[in-house]
Regions:
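Hydrophobic, lipid-facing positions within transmembrane beta-strands of outer-membrane proteins
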Residues: 35-37, 53-57, 92-96, 113-115, ...
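Gram-negative (and chloroplast) outer-membrane scaffold detector with strong preference
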Residues: 67, 72-139, 149-153
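Cleavable N-terminal export/targeting peptides
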Residues: 1-28
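Outer-membrane beta-barrel transmembrane domain signature
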Residues: 118-186
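Transmembrane beta-barrel strands of outer-membrane/channel proteins
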Residues: 35-43, 61, 71-75, 115-123, ...
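Short loop/turn motifs that connect adjacent beta-strands in outer-membrane beta-barrel proteins
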Residues: 20-33, 66, 103-112, 165-172
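Residue-level signature of outer-membrane beta-barrel architecture
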Residues: 61, 100-102, 161-165
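Short glycine/proline- and aromatic-enriched beta-strand/turn motifs that initiate or cap beta-hairpins
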Residues: 19-62, 72
Length: 186
């Protein structure tokens, strides 16, 4: 009986001294400002040579180690002149979301591949100056519609890569953003 109690005593003391003393108060997450602001240079340059005028900027900040929040905002103006249609649309849009860094460069944590999602909204004005309709006897006629204000909402996935240009504060960011239209006003 004493042998059994002696073993229980030693094992109990062994478990007692083997425990790590952990601080019961967890440190709070402290946000450190790390805002990155970007401009869509490609579409802004193409706007000089086409009917579509698209100007877009974005801001992103690291929320946690691999997770970042992103906000995109811009202005889009487009003219459609095909198949007898004469239409134009112009307005603003905004997208809010986040992304996860899938792989990062060891030397620069901002370089790497990422994936994420966004919710988007657009508020625009559209006008149809000419809409082709088939008249009696096959004659061409055109219908004009008054301008109207519209809004659209969508869900967007994003996957891309970002690389720093040399040792500067500039980055090249290439991404694909497929969209799913959730709702549009009529």
């Amino acid at each position: 009986m004493k042998t059994k109690l002696t073993f229980i005593l030693f094992f109990s003391l062994g478990f007692f001294f083997a425990q790590e003393k952990k601080d019961s108060i967890k440190p709070k997450y402290k946000y450190e400002p790390n805002l990155a602001i970007g401009v869509d240079v490609l579409n802004a340059a193409l706007s000089a040579f086409s009917d579509r005028k698209l100007f877009q900027a974005h801001a992103s900040t690291k929320v946690r180690r691999n997770i970042s929040a992103v906000l995109d905002a811009g202005y889009d103006k487009n003219v459609y002149l095909k198949g007898g249609y004469d239409a134009s649309a112009k307005g603003i849009f905004a997208k809010l979301g986040g992304f996860y860094m899938l792989s990062m460069d060891q030397e620069n944590k901002d370089n790497g591949f990422y994936a994420g999602g966004k919710l988007g909204a657009s508020f625009y004005e559209q006008e149809y100056k000419a809409v082709p309709i088939r008249a009696f006897g096959g004659a061409d006629q055109y219908l004009q519609l008054p301008s109207s204000k519209q809004s659209s909402y969508w869900v967007e996935a994003m996957i891309g890569a970002r690389v720093q240009l040399f040792k500067s504060n500039f980055y090249v960011d290439v991404n694909a953003q497929p969209r799913y239209l959730a709702y549009t006003s009529k």
